[in-house]
A protein has these predicted regions:
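Conserved mixed alpha/beta core segments that line enzyme active sites in large multi-domain catalysts
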Residues: 102-143, 192-530
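Short runs of predominantly hydrophobic/aromatic residues within well-ordered alpha helices
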Residues: 25, 45-49, 61-62, 124, ...
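Short hydrophobic alpha-helical segments that form membrane-spanning helices or hydrophobic packing faces
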Residues: 62-68, 130, 160-162, 236-238
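Short active-site loop/helix that positions an aromatic residue
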Residues: 131-136, 162-168
Length: 530
């Protein structure tokens, strides 16, 4: 019965002397790392590890450990390391299964999603938690073995803290009556968060050294009907000041400003035109690891983007239900602000309609990108949300080494687009190494995520993502799913067919147009024949 795995696992010498008792996975890791080689071989050959794991419900791990043979490894050190890696991956995956609350004294880096305070997670954080669960419950990651696919580490401050902040500082009346965003921001910055939240944030800040994005996650944000996506504030923080007190203060200021954005004029106007009331809105806050790399004091990912399952503006033989992707070099603000980015159908990644001529390529290509300035002299919150990031030209990206994943050149010699940076000419972004040469399976990943998202949500979906590709060949490239949310679908979905026979009735036509829609306040159209 002892060898069936019930109860504790007792490590012994081959002669039966007890060495150490194990009751959970962390203790098992410690034992594997410390017991003598003879004991390790004895238990491995006798299948005691897999028996104990299976009896304690770790069936997947047991099935991985069972077929292992010591002869398959170079030495016992390699054997130990492999066993530890398998167990650590199981611990990490189990902890990633749920949103857990932060502990008072420690922050666990193996947990992808942690909550501070109670209440709702808000729309954006709820979508992030859903994305994590969707990835975990599928075999999605197994299809891309050499790529790290996950959501960024995130801490969510539930809406209970927002309620307490508003009540403790008696803010409701003033927040609703102030006329300008500047007045509202000042009101909130002069208010205090409670000590319990401050202490939890202090535990978090002590443990993380990477740049952070402090994002809104209101109740109405990213909902399928009348969403407020993009209406509230997001602040990027280098999180690299020398003093803990300063880093903590930056996060607290960013949280207050996100809270304040609940009452800014744009969201208030949008809510007033809906079935909702501003008094119903509550704000959760996500503090998320920024995805990117440090390029000479600038922090940004080589690729960021969005993917939508429905294409409102198909051209040529593209179809609406084939979706559309927008890609940009650097942080995603380029796309969020509607600036120049690369647009293509995931079904035809090699076809770029916006580059139908050299002139069009020059006019349509992204020519600048956003990054976080990591300089200690830069105060990330001093000039508000819009000045929170810095803009750079493509020559800087080439110097950084990040343009090689997205850049091409319009050759000065023959005025032809070359998928190489070794020619003289104008730099443009085509993402040819990804879309044409398959250096990273981005299109396949996005296709799979769109299918999974539509099945899970039961509607058209929009995905936000970022990609890290490293120069170090031993480091896995990363695909970070930043958000998945219902896509806003308004107006008619009816397909309008124009027959060839009706060409003589067409008074104006174009090969590059917006999709159809409805404008109900236009009564007359005046056409002037050019």
């Amino acid at each position: 019965v002892r060898n069936f795995g019930f109860g504790d696992l007792i490590f012994r010498t081959p002669k039966g002397k007890e060495l150490i008792t194990v009751s959970n996975l962390p203790e098992l890791i410690n034992a594997i790392q410390t017991v003598p080689e003879g004991s390790l071989l004895y238990h491995a050959k006798s299948n005691h590890f897999s028996n104990w794991l299976a009896a304690h419900g770790y069936l997947g791990l047991a099935s991985q450990v069972r077929p292992l043979n010591h002869a398959d490894f170079k030495n016992s050190t390699a054997h130990r390391a492999y066993l530890v890696e398998l167990i650590e991956n199981t611990i990490k995956n189990r902890k990633a299964r749920q949103v857990v609350e932060i502990q008072r004294d420690t922050f666990d880096h193996t947990k992808r999603f942690t909550q501070i305070s109670g209440g709702s997670l808000g729309g954006k954080a709820r979508g992030l938690a859903f994305a994590q669960k969707m990835i975990r419950l599928s075999d999605f990651r197994d299809r891309y073995d050499g790529i790290e696919i996950n959501i960024p580490h995130a801490v969510v401050i539930g809406t209970d803290s927002f309620d307490e902040f508003m009540k403790q500082n008696n803010l409701w009346s003033d927040a609703l009556s102030k006329k300008t965003n500047k007045q509202i921001s000042k009101l909130f910055l002069n208010s205090n968060i409670n000590e319990e939240l401050k202490n939890s944030l202090k535990v978090f800040v002590k443990s993380v050294k990477y740049p952070l994005a402090v994002r809104s996650s209101s109740l109405l944000e990213d909902s399928q009907y009348q969403p407020l996506s993009g209406m509230y504030a997001t602040y990027m923080l280098p999180n690299n000041r020398k003093k803990l007190k300063e880093r903590l203060e930056d996060i607290i200021v960013a949280i207050k400003l996100v809270y304040a954005s609940t009452f800014f004029q744009d969201p208030k106007s949008l809510i007033s035109g809906s079935v909702h009331h501003i008094e119903e809105e509550k704000m959760a806050v996500i503090i998320m690891q920024m995805v990117g790399q440090n390029y000479n004091g600038r922090y940004y990912p080589p690729i960021s983007g969005t993917a939508q399952s429905f294409n409102f503006y198909p051209v040529s033989y593209m179809k609406r239900n084939e979706g559309v992707v927008h890609l940009a070099l650097g942080l995603g603000r380029t796309i969020a602000n509607g600036e120049k980015s690369l647009r293509f159908s995931p079904k035809y990644p090699g076809i770029l309609p916006q580059y139908y001529s050299i002139k069009a390529a020059l006019e349509s290509s992204q020519n600048s990108f956003y990054a976080m300035d990591l300089s200690p002299k830069n105060h990330p919150l001093f000039n508000g949300e819009e000045k929170n990031l810095s803009s750079y030209n493509l020559e800087i990206a080439e110097t950084d080494g990040s343009l090689k994943w997205s850049g091409s050149i319009i050759s000065k010699e023959d005025n032809v687009i070359r998928d190489s940076l070794s020619y003289d000419g104008t730099r443009i972004t085509t993402f040819a190494p990804i879309l044409k040469w398959g250096k990273f399976p981005l299109v396949d990943i996005l296709k799979d995520l769109i299918i999974m998202g539509k099945e899970a949500l039961g509607c058209e979906v929009e995905i936000e993502f970022a990609v890290n590709i490293f120069d170090d060949p031993n480091r896995k490239p990363e695909f970070a799913l930043l958000q998945i949310k219902p896509m806003v679908m308004g107006g008619s979905r009816e397909i309008i067919n124009i027959e060839e026979e009706s060409n003589n009735e067409i008074f104006c036509s174009s090969k590059v147009t917006l999709g159809d829609g409805l404008i109900d306040n236009v009564r007359h159209i005046v056409f002037v024949d050019p």
